[in-house]
Amino acid sequence: MAQSAVVKNEIIEKFKTHEGDTGSSEVQIALLTDRIQYLTDHFKTHKKDHHSRQGLLKLVGQRRSLLDYLKKKNVTTYRELIKALGIRK
């Protein structure tokens, strides 16, 4: 299922760095995290949905790449974002 426009806009508003920001690394990571969480919940009930699992792995790799880029670019923003999203345990 695609993200609803309302949820997507809420995430963008929360993580934007400036007005009109929809494509910064922070926003992209937050949107990917939301999709990953949705798919993770989906797999709790649909254990044999292997096709979607491939998509999940692709999303996780995409998020990992963006996180690596952000860490290289700005470590403090990286740490704040991870804490806000609750990614690392």
Swiss-Prot record:
Organism expressing this protein natively: Desulfotalea psychrophila (strain LSv54 / DSM 12343)
Quaternary structure, from the entry: Part of the 30S ribosomal subunit. Forms a bridge to the 50S subunit in the 70S ribosome, contacting the 23S rRNA.
Gene3D superfamilies for this protein: 6.10.250.3130, S15/NS1, RNA-binding (1.10.287.10)
GO biological process annotation, one example: translation
NCBIfam families: S15_bact (TIGR00952)
Protein name: Small ribosomal subunit protein uS15
Keywords of this entry: Ribonucleoprotein, Ribosomal protein, RNA-binding, rRNA-binding
Amino-acid biosynthesis recorded as keyword: no
